[in-house]
């Protein structure tokens, strides 16, 4: 796992060069946007249960066969596993946002996820749909446009961080499908 700082150091070391120029400017921007980044992570973490349960509910509303006998969310145990997986995915998305780097998401969450879902018979199209609902909710909370809750946010535009979270969710969807 690399954070924004480690990534710059590794890249500079590979070039046998000092950290400077555009790398240094990128780190300055990362630090300047630190409060917005922390507030964005907090918006996701504070609303994680809501984000995940809404995503799973939306997925089921669009595919009621999931809760019918034989469906992948039929029985409390399977529903709990589905909610747990959603929480884990969202947690790693928040870790990536905090670090400013997707490697933690890639290495510890997405590596082998599709193969695991296929082995368990989890319908990937439904999982991708749940991730897209989580993406929309997380972006809404970061940009403070979620209809049910308004939070104090850092001054300034958080659209870049919302786009960053959206890109991490897109990585999850691509890894599953």
Curated annotation (Swiss-Prot):
It is found in: Plastid, Chloroplast thylakoid membrane. InterPro entries: Globin-like_sf, Phycobilisome_asu/bsu, Phycobilisome_asu/bsu_sf. It is a peripheral membrane protein. Contains two covalently linked phycoerythrobilin chromophores and one covalently linked phycourobilin chromophore. Phycourobilin binds at residues 50, 61. GO terms for biological process: photosynthesis. (2R,3E)-phycoerythrobilin 2 binds at residue 158. The keyword Secreted does not apply. (2R,3E)-phycoerythrobilin 1 binds at residue 82. PANTHER family: C-PHYCOCYANIN BETA SUBUNIT, PHYCOBILISOME 32.1 KDA LINKER POLYPEPTIDE, PHYCOCYANIN-ASSOCIATED, ROD 2-RELATED. This is R-phycoerythrin beta chain.
């Amino acid at each position: 796992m690399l954070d924004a700082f480690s990534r710059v150091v590794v890249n500079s070391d590979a070039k046998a060069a000092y950290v400077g120029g555009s790398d240094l400017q990128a780190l300055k921007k990362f630090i300047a946007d630190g409060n917005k980044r922390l507030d964005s992570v907090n918006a996701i973490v504070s609303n994680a249960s809501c984000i995940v349960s809404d995503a799973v509910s939306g997925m089921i509303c669009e595919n009621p066969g999931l809760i019918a006998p034989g469906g992948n969310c039929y029985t409390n145990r399977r529903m709990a596993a589905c909610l747990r997986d959603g929480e884990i995915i969202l947690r790693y998305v928040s870790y990536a946002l905090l670090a400013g780097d997707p490697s933690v998401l890639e290495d510890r969450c997405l590596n082998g996820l599709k193969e695991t879902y296929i082995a368990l018979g989890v319908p990937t199209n439904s999982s991708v749909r749940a991730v897209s609902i989580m993406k929309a909710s997380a972006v809404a909370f970061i940009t403070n446009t979620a209809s049910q809750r308004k939070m104090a946010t850092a001054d300034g535009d958080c659209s870049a961080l919302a786009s960053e979270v959206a890109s991490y969710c897109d990585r999850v969807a691509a890894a599953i499908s």
